[in-house]
Amino acid sequence: MNFKYIVAVSFLIASAYARSVQNDEQSLSQRDVLEEESLREIRGIGGKILSGLKTALKGAAKELASTYLHRKRTAEEHEVMKRLEAVMRDLDSLDYPEEASERETRGFNQDEIANLFTKKEKRILGPVLSLVGNALGGLIKKIG
């Protein structure tokens, strides 16, 4: 009798443990899915913000280029224009990321590709903002 009781209790404990492990796995997988969805949403929002920022910077650079286009430029202004043109090419290259697609086909994971884009955007946006700030500062000084 005691042996049957011990076996029955052991079976109940084992089945309860198996159910709890299964429930834990399900809740973890549900959390993983929710985390992945929220990360996708955050990346989507970040992408939209960066896209808007790129568009604004392109517009500002084009406006600066058009103001410098129809008058004589100093050597410094000519250098600024060359830098703006280079920045515009770099911003356009963000829209067509050939490097990333090549890396993806070679087996890089998505995190490495996202880090590559983040580094590239930081490398481009820093000089763009300083160039636009310097050009606008120069225009304000000339106007004022």
Swiss-Prot record:
Q: Does the keyword Signal apply?
A: yes
Could you tell me which Pfam families the record lists for this protein?
Bombinin
Q: Name one GO cellular component term.
A: extracellular region
In what tissue types does this protein appear?
Expressed by the skin glands.
- Specify the signal sequence span: 1-18
Pro-sequence residue ranges: 19-43, 73-122
* Function per UniProt: Maximin-3 shows antibacterial activity against both Gram-positive and Gram-negative bacteria. It also shows antimicrobial activity against the fungus C.albicans, but not against A.flavus nor P.uticale. It has little hemolytic activity. It possess a significant cytotoxicity against tumor cell lines. It possess a significant anti-HIV activity. It shows high spermicidal activity. Maximin-H16 shows antimicrobial activity against bacteria and against the fungus C.albicans. Shows strong hemolytic activity.
**According to the entry, what is the taxonomic lineage of the organism?**
Eukaryota, Metazoa, Chordata, Craniata, Vertebrata
Instruction: State the Gene Ontology BP annotations.
Output: defense response to bacterium; defense response to fungus; killing of cells of another organism
- Protein name as catalogued: Maximins 3/H16
InterPro entries noted in UniProt? Bombinin
Source organism superkingdom: Eukaryota
| Family to which this protein belongs | Belongs to the bombinin family.
- Residue positions, PTM Isoleucine amide: I143
Compartment list:
Secreted
Hydrolase among keywords? no
